Amino acid sequence: MKLVVSTTLPLKDYRGIEFSKDKKDVQIFRQVHGIISDSWLVDRSNKVNLPFASVALPEYSLNFPIKNIDLDTACFNRSKELIASNKKIYVLWSGGIDSTLTVVALLEADIPKDQIYVVCNTDSLKENYNFFLKISDRVNFVSTERVMQILKYDNLDGMVLSAEHGDLSYGYDFSSEMLQILGPDYLKLPATRENIVKYFTHKKLDVESANCWYDVFMESAKNSPRPIDTTYDFSWWAGFNWRWQYALEKFRMRFYRIPDSTTFFIGQDIQNWSIHHQQPDLNNLRDFKPEYKKIIFRYTGDEDYYKNKIKHESTTLYYGSNSYAAVLENQSRIHTKDFDLFSYYQEDNFINQWICR
């Protein structure tokens, strides 16, 4: 049985240190969490095996028809697809750019008021109070705390819709750090070993591990639906491929029953927009996601938000302590007290092959 998603905590404490003493591949694997934090990496292109046996679920497959589509059309099509489910839609709204775009797209597609429930808390209102006022007569509001309590023990009477994948569709994770650490010109450089290793070593990977992870990502990029030419493209692929499954499964893992849940940006048309969108001119954090903010501005007329809004972490919306440590491919969940990550170790993996090359 393979892992769908797992906590990374055992890799970071004494257990990871002890297990990796005689395993160079695990030592290299552990280092990547200095750049991707707690994300459980799964190659949805099915090109590369890492040291712990994981499976890419069909839900996240890259095997869909590739076409060029504009973001407006993609958002409209995704909204109509969700509305056609005839389910109540509980939108997790943090007040941030991605979740605000999700709400705007649904409203522009004329979602009935009795179908849309905006899940928010005081942090959501602090981040985007004007939008809260703007939509107050078109949606139903429900508190984050109430929804999370229900999901701990039961399912909602509808679908949970998050804006996870919004960052990954845009290549935000690595590129925002690259911009701040190495400057805007770096994002236009070729995705060569020298350039990517420079970023990795700035993030405290040793030189050998940095070179190995460059090869891990570039080997999987052979299956990318988009050329990986620049460091920005590299950032896009790291999220769009490697963190895609984790983005939704980290939410599902939290609850006793797997909720009826999806993300707005997982729609195939939006993924196609992501594949084809051109690198924007990025000079500071305000320059990220102009296409998202343009759609929001069209609905709200909030010029300050359009020009100056930057991403903030939105984890207070629905993340916290979690009693589950992993989800297996049969969808069973394992409690933290019962979980042994190292029992999923597989010696036949790309990093070992790289070491022995």
Regions found by a protein language model. Give the residues of each.
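Conserved G/P- and acidic residue-centered "switch" motifs that form tight phosphate/ATP-binding loops
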Residues: G96
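Active-site signature of alpha/beta-hydrolase-fold catalytic machinery across serine-
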Residues: L101-E108
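Short, electropositive, low-hydrophobicity segments enriched in small/polar residues
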Residues: S99-T100, D167
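Nucleotide-activated chemistry modules centered on ATP-dependent adenylation/adenylyltransferase
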Residues: K2-N68, D72-K88, A105, Y117-R357
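Phosphate-handling active-site elements
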Residues: D110-I116
